[in-house]
Structures are given as C-alpha cells and as structure tokens.
Amino acid sequence: MLANYFPILVFLGISLFIAVLALTMGWFFGPRRPDKAKLSPYECGFEAFQDARLPFDVRFYLVAILFIIFDLETAFLFPWAVVLRHIGWFGFWAMMVFLAILVVGFIYEWKRGALEWE
C-alpha cells in the first residue's frame, strides 16, 4: 500500500533537493556587497518619503481573523455537502454543531463591536 505513495515521496525529495541546492548556490556564489541603497525600501524608483513601517489598526486583524474563520467554514462545508448522503445523521448533526458554534462566535464578535469602524 505504501508503494502507491512512493512516486509522491520521490517528487517531494527531488523538489526539496532542488530548492536547497538553489538557495545554497545563491548564498555561496552571490555577491555580498550591501550598501545603504540596497538596504533601503524601494518605492517606485523614488526615495522613501517616510518610514515604511506604520502600525496597523487592530480592527484589520479582527477582520482578517473573521475572514479566515469563515473561509475555513466554507472549506469544511463544501466537502460535507458532497458526502452528506453517505455520512448519515451523525455527520449532519456534527456539522450543525460546528455551524452553531460559528454563529455564536459571530454574534459574540458583533455584540462586542468588533465589526464597527468608528
């Protein structure tokens, strides 16, 4: 049975070897002459107007986390819908519990004001 996965293992091994070889060759043979211009951020050919490292508002992180959570919900929901006939009532109720937990979490975030942009 493991013989079926051997070509995948060979492919991953060769890919890893090529990636490590390319990185190693670049590190050994590449020039190491950093100067101020090479270490500065690049902004369309102009000198940087201000520091490129600005703090982000926490609300962006909250929206990103909510997006990831509901994106994962979709990733679980589509395969579940495909195999729903085969998994029976246990699979149905397991997904309903999962969706209920997500809905409760969404309502909690909504009530806490995480979605308001004041």
From Swiss-Prot:
GO MF annotation list: NADH dehydrogenase (ubiquinone) activity; NADH:ubiquinone reductase (non-electrogenic) activity; quinone binding
Domain of life, source organism: Bacteria
Keywords carried by this UniProt record: Cell inner membrane, Cell membrane, Membrane, NAD, Quinone, Translocase, Transmembrane, Transmembrane helix, Transport, Ubiquinone
GO cellular component: NADH dehydrogenase complex; plasma membrane
Family: Belongs to the complex I subunit 3 family.
Gene: nuoA
Major subcellular site: membrane
Phylogenetic classification of the source organism: Bacteria, Pseudomonadati, Pseudomonadota, Gammaproteobacteria, Legionellales
EC number(s) from the headed UniProt entry: 7.1.1.-
Assembly and interaction partners: NDH-1 is composed of 14 different subunits. Subunits NuoA, H, J, K, L, M, N constitute the membrane sector of the complex.
Keyword Transport: yes
The protein's name in its UniProt record: NADH-quinone oxidoreductase subunit A
Location of the protein in the cell: Cell inner membrane
Reactions performed catalytically: a quinone + NADH + 5 H(+)(in) = a quinol + NAD(+) + 4 H(+)(out)
